């Protein structure tokens, strides 16, 4: 989790956990992170009738065909995306950002905050398992390899299964 004040509040969750119904989600959601995980979560939550806004640190989203398709779906659902936003703090009823470039402070009222940024792979955990079963070939796929999209994870899992 990113280290910001309020990150440990009870209404702050990992976006994938919310998408899998593993935690309670309110009606007005701020998603922190506009990468594939954040955009996928925005599609999921807006499809459930939630009001969603995505906040991203970088100035522009896009690049891959998958991202462009997610952005198209979000536009259809009227999901707002705010770029150039650095998360400053999380409160009970809002999130606070600094607008990069202007230094302005911006607040967004919400009842749920979903984190889709700051993901890191845990390859050291995989390496520990390799030593437990040295005769077994271990394949690393999905976010265990590096933060990536669900499509890439499925492709890697498929390739690993073929090699087993």
Where in this protein do the model-derived segments appear?
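A conserved short coil-to-beta-strand element within the FAD-binding core of flavoproteins
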Residues: 1-2, 83-94
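Rossmann-like dinucleotide/flavin-binding elements
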Residues: 1-65, 98-164
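Residues that recognize and position ribonucleotide moieties
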Residues: 80, 88, 106-108
């Amino acid at each position: 989790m990113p280290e910001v004040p309020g990150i440990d509040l009870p209404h702050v969750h990992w976006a994938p956990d919310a998408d899998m119904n593993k935690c309670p989600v309110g009606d007005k959601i701020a998603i922190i992170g506009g990468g594939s995980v954040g955009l996928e979560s925005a599609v999921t939550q807006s499809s459930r009738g939630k009001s969603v806004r995505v906040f991203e640190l970088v100035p522009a989203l896009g690049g891959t065909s998958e991202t462009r398709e997610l952005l198209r779906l979000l536009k259809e659902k009227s999901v707002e995306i705010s770029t150039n936003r650095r998360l400053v703090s999380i409160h009970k009823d809002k999130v606070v950002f600094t607008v990069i470039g202007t230094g302005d402070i911006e607040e967004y009222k919400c009842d749920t905050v979903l984190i889709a940024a700051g993901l890191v792979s845990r390859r050291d955990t995989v390496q520990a398992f390799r030593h437990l079963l040295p005769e077994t070939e271990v394949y690393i796929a999905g976010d265990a390899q590096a933060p990536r999209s669900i499509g890439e994870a499925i492709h890697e899992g498929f390739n690993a299964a073929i090699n087993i």
